[in-house]
Structures are given as C-alpha cells and as structure tokens.
Design a protein with these regions (language model features):
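A cross-kingdom feature marking charged/low-complexity
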Residues: 42-71
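Short, well-ordered alpha-helical segments
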Residues: 1-37
Length: 71
C-alpha cells in the first residue's frame, strides 16, 4: 500500500468550507480511497466589495493499492 498526494483547487460561491468539500468530492470521483486532506491556502475573488467566489488550494492523500484488491 502506498499513499499518493494530489494537489487540487476547490471552488464555491458559498464558503471556503464548501470549496474544500468540492475538491474532496472531485478527487473521490476517480474511486480513490481518500485518507486525508491538507488545506494549503484560501483565496477569494471580489467584485464590488463582495466576495463572490471562494477557493481552497488543497493536498489530498489517497491510498494506492498498485493493482491489489481493495478490502
């Protein structure tokens, strides 16, 4: 068993928390068994003084079974 790490950017129009969830959900689409997430950075787009898009740069760790059956 190896653990691999992927860097992703999650986005949300609601919150940074939802941006992190978005990144995790996207990573899970590949069938990866996610074991953890590390938030590296938060940013936001601002228009007319309001935050309109939240972004979270994350590292997602997942199990790599190298062709072995998952249990």
């Amino acid at each position: 068993l190896q653990v691999k790490v992927a860097e992703l950017v999650g986005e949300s129009s609601n919150s940074w928390k939802d941006a992190v969830r978005s990144a995790v959900k996207e990573a899970a689409k590949d069938g990866n068994q996610i074991t953890g997430v590390e938030v590296m950075n938060f940013t936001a787009n601002v228009q007319n003084g309001d935050m309109v898009e939240y972004k979270a740069n994350v590292k997602i760790a997942y199990a790599d079974y190298g062709g072995e059956q998952r249990r």
